[in-house]
């Protein structure tokens, strides 16, 4: 493990592996950089991969108060560690974060961007966005109800059946999810009301590949909307892949895009 110091002096931990052009992975939802370690290992045969813990996750610090701009600065520090520029891959909500970072001043450092199933919940997608999501998360946090925070995320943000999540709460790994529950408030900060801010997305000039798996209709709907809004976008569907995409399915897509 290595680390960099972000602009506000927060320590950001990362793993570096492989050789070749630099690729930065922006992940971490209710977990740490180990979530994307299998993908990093596959990409390492052709790229130097920087897989980092977002602030508040894993071995990285979490200086308060939180602001989305601090996460842009964290990514900026990782890009500097990667030599000043890199290809960037972001998955799900962190993919939205990477998209906003590209539009928020980091475009010169991001050679190309690839994002997997940005979880915007749009009108016409067949899903209803959760109401007062961040406020409810914050209230549950104040009451010490971390398990209910995670349940709220899975049921109302992800769209999983409540009955399934009730079963998941009995799993031995659920306690680890509860430990990461405070980071859901950070994610809610940049996801907002889950709508896609078309004007903001349209200003992202970085060449971007928007990928989905075709298995979750509302996420495919969002992927199409993002790609149609970006000025320099390509689309790709990895047929048959759920939201928890297999590294073996994703790696060749990223290799092709980042090598072209």
What are these regions (language model features)?
Residues 231-260:
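Catalytic active-site module of serine/aspartate enzymes centered on a nucleophile-bearing elbow/loop
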Residues 41, 50-89, 93:
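Active-site loop/oxyanion-hole signature of alpha/beta-hydrolase fold enzymes
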Residues 172-196:
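Hydrophobic, aromatic-rich cap/lid helix
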Residues 217-222:
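Conserved alpha/beta-hydrolase "acid-adjacent" motif
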Residues 204, 210-212:
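Short beta-strand/loop motif that positions the catalytic acidic residue
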Residues 118, 122-172, 187-188:
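Helix-rich cap/lid subdomain of alpha/beta-hydrolase
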Residues 3-61:
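Conserved HGGG/HGGXW glycine-rich cap/lid loop of the alpha/beta-hydrolase fold
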Residues 85-125:
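Conserved hydrolase catalytic core segment
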